[in-house]
Amino acid sequence: MSIDLEQYDRRRTAMLALLRVAADAAPFSEWMKYSESIARGKREKLELYLKVLYMLLRDLLVLREGGLDIRNRDIRLQLEPLANKVSFAWIRTAVKKADDLAELLRRNIQKTIALDALILELRGSGS
């Protein structure tokens, strides 16, 4: 078993963009290039993106609460401003929405529509 670091980095970059846009720290247009790329990757499963999203949300929570032990240390400088922008309630809502998406995976949902909806719902929930 091996880890394809290039694919992981690509997913992480996309999910970080999703979080930045969802937190209203970036315009929706920033997400569009990733959304289109995800749509083209028809064989790539949404679960792989959700795993990365959960790790990033964990890091945001740790940083927001003053902790130091994050998993994505190499992007700390990108995560810190975002962690300072969002509230605990926003992170909780983001986790709940990701959980809801995970539940829908069995229904063969459209990845990009689901992720776009996640962004819009979080943007509406306030940072």
Regions found by a protein language model. Name each.
Residues 1-52, 56-57, 63-127:
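Charged, glycine-rich active-site and insertion segments that engage polyanionic ligands
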